[in-house]
Amino acid sequence: MTSHPVFIDLSLDEQVQELRKYFKKLGAEISSEKSNKGVEDDLHKIIGVCDVCFKDGEPAQIDGILNSIVSIMITIPLDRGENIVLAYCEKMTKAPNQPLAKVCLQSLWRLFNNLDTASPLRYHVYYHLVQVAKQCDQVLEVFTGVDQLKSQFANCPPSSEQMQKLYRLLHDVTKDTNLERSSKVMIELLGTYTADNACVAREDAMKCIVTALADPNTFLLDPLLSLKPVRFLEGDLIHDLLSIFVSEKLPAYVEFYEEHKEFVNSQGLNHEQNMKKMRLLTFMQLAESNAEMSFEALTKELQITENEVEPFVIEVLKTKLVRARLDQANRKVHISSTMHRTFGAPQWEQLRDLLQAWKENLSSVREGLTNVASAQLDLARSQKLIH
């Protein structure tokens, strides 16, 4: 989201005077006279009534008024500006409709970018900015990912408690439109807990698991099991369900669902979507140990008909998690490679053996090339002696 620098070609006193007159004219309970307590008191009074312009003003006009308020606000020293900034942010969340919410969003973004990057107030502005972005469907304009979020606060990192609060908000505003991003936010949230306080993160851990399971583009779920708050859920149904998605096959999920239908539905999970994901995960697991699979075997493992095998495999290939070739003539699927669902000690050993084999092959090639080069050199020398 772009933002223009704040600059008003009037003195602070003149701006304050004009704003007071403007809001009084709109019917706000404010004096048109400047406060004798200074510009900060003026700002408190102006911000207290600034939402009166939301009633009848045009968006462009309101944007200009808010821009004037921001231009004064950023001149206030940090140690005296917190209450003023927080009061303004609260007012910006009160926009009565989407067009005005966009104006308020632009104003908050302008304030955010004009505050010093080392100012702790930027966190509070950004938090309210996300709230307003949700109101006008502009969340993707202000939050593009966790890396971008962290870079914005690099010069003044918020506390763990503040980031937890922000991550919860970001999860809430993205869960209906971008499950993948929402899932990453929840994983970051759980990563902020330590062994000492992970036990209090039960609700966050459950939300994280549900979001990851519901995301149609998240297939590698093994890392969730290592998160401390998730470990505290061992023995709970949600942890059992996660474990199935991490390492079990389709029949295990079907059995779990038959025994705990109410629980699965109560978490907001869609059974058919779960079946679709578990079929893909089951196929990945089968591909790890089978270079080829018959259509008949796949119908049994995936609980689909033979006519559904080809469309299913094509969908799997689109994810790029598995590389394979369909052999329609022989009713088989030939596997080239697959991503592992879990990556533990066996996978590390397999990787080590593969790298060792590559090393030995490269050594053999190098030795062969050295021998060829040596033979060519000897031949050249012998021919030189003959002549």
UniProtKB/Swiss-Prot annotation:
GO terms for biological process: formation of cytoplasmic translation initiation complex; Golgi organization; protein secretion; sperm individualization. The keyword Cytoplasm applies. It is found in: Cytoplasm; Golgi apparatus. GO terms for cellular component: cytosol; eukaryotic 43S preinitiation complex; eukaryotic 48S preinitiation complex; eukaryotic translation initiation factor 3 complex, eIF3m; Golgi apparatus; investment cone. One of its GO terms (molecular function) is caspase binding. Signal peptide: none annotated. SMART domains: PINT. Component of the eukaryotic translation initiation factor 3 (eIF-3) complex. The eIF-3 complex interacts with pix. Belongs to the eIF-3 subunit M family. This is Eukaryotic translation initiation factor 3 subunit M. It comes from Drosophila willistoni (Fruit fly).
